[in-house]
Amino acid sequence: MEEGERWIVVPTWRVPGRMEKWHSLVKYLKHRTKDLEGVCYVPHHKVGWAWWTCSRVIFPLQGNSHLEIQAYWNLTPEKGWLSSYAVRITWYTERFWTDVTPDCADSLIHSTYFSCFTAGEVRRAIRGEKLLSCCNYPQAHRSKVPLLQFLALVVVQQNGRPQKNSTTRKRWRSNYWRGFRLARKDGRGHKQRGSEPPASGAYFPGVAKVLEILA
């Protein structure tokens, strides 16, 4: 009995243009600014047998996991060579792997790379003071990365509560509820609080924006 063709179906995200913008940004952040120094960029001529793969960008993450953004080309050969592009975004851990959305990829990348709020900003948030820096990866905060006010509350909880019947305890209680109200207010709009000078490091606009991904 003759065996028929077998197809492997994977979820991909369409890319309207060519991949040069994505490749150039990755190489710039890897070799020039060093923000992505630990990232592995594999061009098409080093991929090997997977001739449909344009490139692979592998982001090592925390906890022995990594994120891989694999670019495909030649998806519609009947319309011309290299006529269509798409990317597959996959998260690998020790026990499982799964395909993720661009928003989830932004959160995973931000957990390891790029400058965010410093410890000093967290202390300012606890005291209710004006923040002096902002995040270099604001796109990632739309999904799973906690707001700064939430991080500040976590720090307060980890440090423990002051003793009873003390001025410090009353001040802590006042700052706690003030921070809680700020967190609830900011959580509705997913907006960052901060002012003019950014944190040190390169700005990253997000995976979907760089690739101009079409859903």
Curated annotation (Swiss-Prot):
Topology relative to the membrane: Peripheral membrane protein
A Pfam family hit: Vif
Gene Ontology cellular-component annotations: host cell cytoplasm; host cell plasma membrane; membrane; virion component
Induction line: Expressed late during infection in a Rev-dependent manner.
InterPro entries per record: Vif
Source taxon at top rank: Viruses
One of the GO biological process terms: viral life cycle
Subcellular location: Host cytoplasm; Host cell membrane; Virion
Chief localisation class: host cell
Record's signal peptide: none
Family that this chain belongs to: Belongs to the primate lentivirus group Vif protein family.
Note: Required for replication in 'nonpermissive' cells, including primary T-cells, macrophages and certain T-cell lines, but is dispensable for replication in 'permissive' cell lines, such as 293T cells. In nonpermissive cells, Vif-defective viruses can produce virions, but they fail to complete reverse transcription and cannot successfully infect new cells. Vif-defective viruses show catastrophic failure in reverse transcription due to APOBEC-induced mutations that initiate a DNA base repair pathway and compromise the structural integrity of the ssDNA. In the absence of Vif, the virion is morphologically abnormal.
Domain notes: The BC-like-box motif mediates the interaction with elongin BC complex. The HCCH motif (H-x(5)-C-x(18)-C-x(5)-H) mediates the interaction with CUL5.
Record text on subunit structure and interactions: Homomultimer; in vitro and presumably in vivo. Interacts with viral Pr55Gag precursor and human APOBEC3G. The interaction between Vif and APOBEC3G is species-specific, which may play a role in restricting the replication of HIV to humans. Forms an E3 ligase complex by interacting with human CUL5 and elongin BC complex (ELOB and ELOC).
Name recorded for this polypeptide: Virion infectivity factor
Organism expressing this protein natively: Human immunodeficiency virus type 2 subtype A (isolate KR)
Gene: vif
